[in-house]
Amino acid sequence: MNTKRKICVVTGTRAEYGLLQPIMKAIKEDKLLELQVAVTGMHLSPEFGLTYKTIEEDDFEISEKIEILLSSDTSIGVAKAIGLATISFSETLNRLKPDFIMILGDRFELLAAAQAALVSRIPIVHLAGGDVTEGAFDEAIRHSITKMSQLHFVTNKESEKRVHQLGEDPESIHLVGNPGLDHLNSLKLMGKNELEKSLRYSFKSKNILVTFHSVTLDNAPSVNSFSALLEALDGLGEDIGIIFTRPNADTEGRQLIKMLDKYVEDRSNCIVYTSLGQLRYLSTVALVDVVVGNSSSGILEAPSLKTATVNIGDRQKGRLRADSIIDCEPITENIKESIQQAFKLDCSTVVNPYGDGNTTERVLKVLREINHPERLIKKHFYDIDFEYS
């Protein structure tokens, strides 16, 4: 009789999988736990690189593939995808019958998974709750998932306070750090020659890694901000090497991809990838001079690799910042000046505020020691005493 505790890990994007991978590996190898993997979202889209194959190449068995993406990336298309995902996840959870479902972050497909788990009475383990990203509707999704979750693994002290403010019992909140940093303690990054061969790209004297996603709560279209970024990159000159990774499948995402592909076509110093994969991505971050854009990786991982970040606009507004991060407005001249400033930044002594790279063991310790997961379902609102004037 199988008495292992079943943990169903949900992943919908390449970036999120990179953060979850150390925990997934540890669950798979643990004698008391059984790993289930539910793959959805961009992982299953040819347009975004069919990155579920990376999960299989990492020797994980995929328990269920849940296709939800529509051809439209308008707000209506995304809303319909959430509905389809909720239906699909309810069927998946009924088949897999996990003891816990594990979710990281704030993507719209994760909201659907959480809703399905909530009504199916399956306890939710939420990683990175309480973080703040004021420029995207992901902010509201993250806090919504917190209220549906029974266990909270937070990345920093400020996030711990926010989850408590949302009425969650302090005993259910565990400060563990950012799981993406665990790799940096064990992963052997690629050297310059090996990476150049793998990327089919020759590094210049100065190099930039660019990832720019749509900003879903911005009043101005994301294409305007992206256009300002591309103009700023042109102003740096052709002797700067630029490596792009494509945007996510968010509202306006496909418009940004079209702009990016057209831009790269005409410029010999630029190259674009749908997905670099975790090893190549982190190796690239470590070898370039600056990470540019509005991806969370510039905030969360780049400081540990001692690489400067130029963070554009409000997508990551509210997150803790290391000293290696320069914030700027999505205006061409501001972006250009910030990149030039970042080239001169010494990041050798930068400290990452998101942990020490030992998140996985902290998470597994809690999962092993929880008695009777089904008893976690019924929560009470944990009030905080406030003084009102």
PLM regions with names:
Residues 343-389:
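C-terminal amphipathic helix plus adjacent low-complexity
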Residues 303-349:
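Nucleotide-sugar donor-binding patch of glycosyltransferase catalytic domains
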Residues 6, 10-11, 18-28, 68-170:
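Active-site and donor-binding regions of nucleotide-sugar-utilizing enzymes
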Residues 30-36, 61, 237-241:
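A generic structural motif
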Residues 44-46, 149-224:
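A nucleotide-sugar donor-handling region in carbohydrate enzymes
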Residues 55, 190-287:
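Donor-nucleotide binding loops and adjacent catalytic segments primarily
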Residues 34-78, 88:
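Conserved nucleotide-sugar phosphate-binding/catalytic loop shared by glycosyltransferases and other
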Residues 103-104, 111, 152, 277-323:
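A donor-sugar binding/catalytic signature common to diverse glycosyltransferases
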